């Protein structure tokens, strides 16, 4: 996931076009992306050994397209610029693809119900639906970009169902790939589950969850547990994909042009070249390393609610069970899969992943 134009974690506000008269985007420039973003996507693909599908998310239209003439502090998209903004988004996608970057997902707006001191823009559910239906999707079709998977909401979970029930209509259903959500208002796993049950064909994607220094301490164990708890709860409720935001920050928790500094799984000091892998990095790896692309979550039961668990079956037939123990006591577990038993103990304040072969014999 990366930002279309600037976001709070940019070095400052910027837009690819700043001239209100440039409706044809002749001055369109991706210079900032070319310098600070695209090289890292290319490096990630190099290390992964395959192409990576990118999610593009706008935090705000250019200032001149908004009611407050400001990228920051909320405001709304001016109606007369709706088509221009839709075409701007299409141009951004095309510029990425012209540079060899695959844009797979697009969200309409980051946190559309929030007025932030940084890049932000407000939409009601009805306004987001109207922009999608009458402006964005037609523009994508005209540009030959209808393959892009559009996800709505991209905000906290507690209003996820409200967004889905408002935005999915007979005319928009085929336009909507799914819904994106954040964790800032609490667990709300039932909201995720409700959307999964009512809209089983829609993708559910976690797109953002920062550990803000202004609200939380720097306790590595607590922060790692926040990640694992949310991932387990969301996966059990029907989540399909998890994006970390941000996986890498500098030693201060930035850069961030409004000092909204945060913790991250990987912290780097650009001056000393030191890299610190936080405990949260290894907690996330319990999922990302063992749960393979194409895996399916499977049903499982547990004898106590003091142990948080989620189970998957990989495309190769292996079973993966992730167990999170946030208590101060060691928890005994006997894992039963297809008649085979594996006994183990889950240490206090720990996360454990068990991988079993298709027939139930433990292999890791």
Give, region by region, the residue ranges found by the protein language model.
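N-terminal catalytic cores of secreted or lumenal carbohydrate-active enzymes
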Residues: 1-103, 124, 134
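Residues that line or immediately flank small-molecule/substrate-binding pockets and catalytic motifs
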Residues: 2-4, 110, 182-183, 246
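Short catalytic/ligand-binding loop motif for oxyanion handling, primarily in non-cytosolic enzymes
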Residues: 6-9, 62-66, 114-115, 159, ...
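Substrate-binding and catalytic surfaces of secreted/luminal carbohydrate-active proteins
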Residues: 54-56, 87-94, 99-104, 115-364
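Active-site loop signature of alpha/beta-hydrolase-fold enzymes
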Residues: 62, 111, 212
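Short, histidine-centered active-site or binding-site loop motifs used for metal coordination
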Residues: 70, 112, 210
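Short, conserved phosphate-binding/catalytic loop or strand-edge motifs used
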Residues: 108-114
């Amino acid at each position: 996931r990366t930002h279309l134009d600037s976001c709070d974690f940019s070095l400052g506000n910027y837009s690819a076009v700043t001239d209100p008269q440039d409706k044809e985007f002749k001055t369109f420039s991706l210079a900032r992306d070319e310098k600070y973003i695209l090289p890292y996507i290319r490096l990630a693909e190099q290390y992964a050994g395959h192409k990576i599908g990118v999610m593009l998310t706008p935090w705000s239209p250019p200032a001149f397209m908004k009611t407050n003439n400001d990228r920051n502090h909320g405001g709304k998209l001016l109606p007369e610029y709706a088509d221009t903004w839709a075409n701007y988004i299409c141009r951004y996608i095309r510029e990425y693809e012209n540079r060899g970057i695959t844009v797979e997902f697009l969200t309409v707006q980051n946190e559309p119900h929030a007025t932030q001191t940084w890049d932000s823009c407000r939409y009601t559910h009805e306004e987001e639906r109207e922009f999608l239906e009458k402006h964005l999707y037609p523009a994508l079709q005209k540009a030959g970009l209808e393959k892009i998977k559009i996800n709505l909401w991209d905000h906290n979970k507690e209003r996820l169902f409200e967004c889905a029930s408002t935005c999915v209509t007979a005319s928009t259903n085929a336009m909507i790939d799914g819904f994106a959500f954040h964790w800032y208002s609490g667990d709300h796993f039932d909201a995720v589950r409700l959307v999964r049950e009512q809209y089983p064909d829609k993708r559910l994607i976690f797109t953002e969850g920062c550990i803000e220094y202004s609200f939380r301490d720097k306790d590595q164990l607590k922060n790692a547990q926040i990640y694992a708890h949310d991932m387990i709860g969301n996966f059990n409720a029907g989540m399909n994909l998890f994006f970390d935001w941000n996986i890498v920050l500098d030693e201060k928790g930035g850069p961030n042009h409004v000092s909204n500094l945060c913790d991250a799984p990987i912290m780097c000091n650009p001056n000393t070249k030191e890299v610190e892998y936080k405990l949260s990095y290894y907690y996330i790896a319990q999922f990302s390393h063992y749960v393979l692309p194409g895996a399916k979550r499977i049903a499982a039961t547990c004898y106590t609610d003091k142990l948080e668990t989620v189970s998957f079956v990989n495309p190769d037939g292996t079973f993966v069970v992730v167990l999170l123990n946030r208590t101060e006591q060691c928890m005994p577990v006997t894992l039963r899969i297809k008649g085979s038993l594996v006994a183990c103990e889950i240490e206090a304040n720990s996360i454990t992943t068990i991988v079993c072969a298709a027939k139930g014999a433990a292999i890791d």
